[in-house]
A protein has these predicted regions:
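A short helix->loop->beta-strand "cap" motif at the edges of active sites that frequently abuts
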Residues: 71, 91-92
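Short, polar/acidic, helix-capping and beta-turn segments at strand->helix junctions
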Residues: 87
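Short, polar loop motifs at secondary-structure junctions
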Residues: 78-82
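A generic, well-ordered mixed alpha/beta core segment in the N-terminal half of proteins
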Residues: 84, 93-95
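Conserved mixed alpha/beta catalytic, RNA-binding, or beta-rich assembly cores of soluble enzyme
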Residues: 1-77, 97-108
């Protein structure tokens, strides 16, 4: 396992974060819910290409955003099969503890 991915996963597991991104010695964290952490990074114009991410839950929408942001790899305790397939299609390694058919939003 890549050292940056390992650090992202360890930080995610130890903290109360919804997202952790790691690239080389750079570590970013977020406690925002849903897609907000990813959308915030896009809106701010942050260069996150080549980072490894550990995210609480990854569905297809989040997977599309990770592709747009240039992720080098994505881990989530829960990931939809569609998200894993999409990330794999873009040659982004995807790892999950549990794969599910769908990710539902808070209202559903």
């Amino acid at each position: 396992m890549n050292q940056a991915m390992k650090k992202a996963k360890e930080t995610f597991a130890q903290g109360n974060y919804t997202c952790v991104w790691c690239r080389d010695n750079e570590l970013l964290t977020s406690k925002e819910a849903g897609l907000r952490p990813l959308l915030t990074r896009i809106r701010e114009g942050k260069d996150l290409s080549g980072f490894y991410a550990a995210d609480k839950i990854v569905g297809r929408a989040a997977a599309f955003l990770y592709v747009k942001l240039g992720a080098a790899g994505v881990y989530a305790p829960v990931m939809s099969r569609g998200a894993k397939e999409l990330l794999t299609e873009y040659n982004i390694p995807a790892e999950a503890d549990e794969l599910t058919e769908n990710i539902r939003n808070r209202q559903n």
